[in-house]
Amino acid sequence: MDPGDGTAPLDESFTETVDFCGRTYQKYALTNGVFFAPIDEDEIARLELMHSVLSRVFDDRLIFPPVGSPRRILDCGCGAGDWAVDAAGRFPDCEVLGIDASPHMVPEDPPSNLEVQIDDLNGRFTFPSDHFDVVHSQMMAGGIHANRWRSYVRDIFRVLNPGGWCQMVEIYFNAQSDNGTLQRGELSYDLLKPP
């Protein structure tokens, strides 16, 4: 990846941490309302588990449509990098770029075709237009400010190649069943319904 193809550079404040209730947090993320999850080993384990669960739910499909041989993939909010590492492994001839606000959870030994940049996705993308074949954004609802969502989605579509694929994955905590077996009034439904 060309170092100029990225987002705005950040200062050293991204490395500062704060401890609270026995957990470590990124000070920048808390101060700027980027995300409120810890950045410690327990959080990395939680992210790995979430990746495993989503992989199983999605029948081990990283990208939903058949995309052939993508040349460039962008993973927005890559966290501990599990999805990006898998994408780099499945598409070894592809450049995979992961972006995350925290430098504390970057994969220790990433594949050679994976680069991770530290940046706040609440700022505008500086990538060139029509640059990526796939843009993946997963579990970003808590990390993108409400007033940024429209421009965030516009940025994603601007940097996608014509015919490229935008894949956004969020969890909607509303218990449902496609065959009607889960009904209102059942304990499992009531426990899982949103407040």
For the regions a language model picked out, list residue spans one by one:
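N-terminal charged/capping segments associated with class I S-adenosyl-L-methionine
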Residues: 1-130, 134, 148, 170-182, ...
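A short His-aromatic
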Residues: 142-146
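Extended, non-catalytic structural segments that build the interaction scaffolds
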Residues: 191-195
